[in-house]
Regions:
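Short, cationic-aromatic polyanion-contact patches
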Residues: 5-11, 63-82
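Conserved segment of winged-helix/HTH DNA-binding domains
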Residues: 74-99
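Short capping segments at the starts of secondary-structure elements
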Residues: 18-26
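Hydrophobic residues on short alpha-helical segments
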Residues: 13-19, 99
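C-terminal regulatory/oligomerization modules of transcriptional regulators
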Residues: 81, 104-129
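Short, hydrophobic-biased segments on the C-terminal half of alpha helices
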Residues: 46-50
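Glycine-centered, phosphate/nucleic-acid-interacting loop/turn motifs that mediate DNA/RNA or nucleotide
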Residues: 56
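Short acidic, hydrophobic short linear motifs in intrinsically disordered regions
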Residues: 25-34
């Protein structure tokens, strides 16, 4: 049976986005990136990164006198899992109500709709083969 990684909190996801952008980061790198948007303590960032390592999202390596961190899974894979977990938890596993909410709230652009149609066509053709 596949074991799921624990869900990311809002702050953890912020940290992961910084690391995915940079590839490899120190606590200071992440702290400075987050500090540009809001006030946060260095020790908070360090604690959160240690938690992310314990959860299995980050790998820590020593480089010179500092530790560097890198993601253990690609951003797309993590987000896919988060969306799947959200749909399961909120919509009992059905994506249809989610799509209806997005369409009703007009959060989907024409470009997004074109991309969705293209993906649906490709998915439908793949199932026919």
């Amino acid at each position: 049976m596949l074991t799921r990684k624990p869900v990311l909190t809002v702050q953890e996801l912020e940290i992961m986005k910084v690391i995915w952008r940079s590839g490899t980061s120190t606590v200071r790198d992440v702290y400075e990136a987050l500090l540009a948007d809001r006030k946060i303590a260095y020790t908070t960032v360090m604690t959160m990164m240690n938690i992310l390592e314990q959860k299995g999202y980050l790998k820590k390596s020593q480089k010179d006198r500092a530790f560097t961190y890198q993601a253990t899974r690609p951003q797309k894979q993590v987000i896919r899992g988060m969306v799947r977990e959200f749909v399961d938890r909120v919509f009992n596993g059905s994506a249809e109500p989610l799509l209806l909410h997005l369409l009703e709230d007009k959060r989907v652009s024409e470009q997004d709709l074109d991309e969705i149609r293209s993906l649906l066509r490709a998915n439908s053709e793949g199932k026919k083969s």
